[in-house]
A protein has these predicted regions:
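Solvent-exposed coil/turn segments that connect beta secondary-structure elements
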Residues: 50-51, 97, 105-107, 142
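Extracytoplasmic/secreted cell-surface and envelope-processing proteins
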Residues: 55-57, 85, 109-113, 148-149
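Proline-aspartate-enriched helix->loop->beta-strand connector
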Residues: 89-102
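Extracellular/periplasmic catalytic domains that process cell-envelope and extracellular macromolecules
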Residues: 38-41, 69, 93-95, 129-133
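Alpha-helical scaffolding within the catalytic cores
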Residues: 26, 33, 84-91, 119-128
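A ligand-binding cleft/hinge motif common to bilobed small-molecule-binding domains
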Residues: 102-120
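Extracytoplasmic substrate-binding proteins
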Residues: 1-54, 77, 132-176
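Alpha-helical, coiled-coil/dimerization segments enriched in small aliphatic residues
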Residues: 56-85
Length: 176
């Protein structure tokens, strides 16, 4: 918000600071408050960034990883540095995440998804993961989770919160 404040001060557009800064910040705060007040168990998650020639686990130092942490999720890559260096099915199986989130990068989302299918999902152990068995494998919108969503930060937080905590989906929708 500090940079937005600076630019709005320079242009004399306090209205834009309120609209694009304070209002968006309030949307995020509303989502976080709802999640915290619900006192639901923190899910173990895995965040993957896939591209046409590979895939990396991402921790909470990544934009989407930080959002997951804000929402109370426990990212298995934060506790398992080996996942950040070398994505291994053995480590994923050992940690057995409840939710798997995938963000693609690069020009071709399909090529990134093909790489995942050929190199992770083709492993027979993949289908035994809790996240896969329960249908909690999510492909995230690149506009909301790879690039900074700017005026759509509130939507990004609501989207993740609804995936992490489906019981809150109606309440989260009411915040939109």
């Amino acid at each position: 918000l500090a940079m937005l404040r600076t630019f709005c001060d320079m242009t004399g557009r306090e209205d834009l600071y309120e609209q694009n800064g304070l209002a968006v910040q309030q949307q995020i705060s509303d989502v976080l408050e709802l999640v915290q007040n619900a006192k639901l168990p923190a899910p173990n998650v895995l965040l993957l960034r896939a591209y046409s020639s590979g895939c990396k686990a991402k921790g909470s130092d990544n934009m989407t990883g930080a959002m997951l942490k804000d929402l109370g999720a426990i990212n298995i890559a934060d506790a398992d540095d080996s996942l950040l260096e070398n994505l291994s099915m053995e480590n994923i199986i050992a940690d057995d995440p409840e939710d798997i989130f995938v963000v693609t990068m690069g020009a071709s989302q399909q090529k990134a998804l093909d790489w995942l299918a050929e190199n992770l999902q083709a492993n027979p152990a993949w289908s035994g993961l809790s996240a896969v068995q329960s249908g909690h494998y999510y492909l995230l919108d690149k506009a909301l989770f790879h690039y900074k969503p700017n005026a759509r930060w509130g939507e990004s937080y609501r989207t993740l919160a609804a995936l992490l905590y489906p019981r809150l989906a109606d309440q989260l929708e009411a915040l939109a």
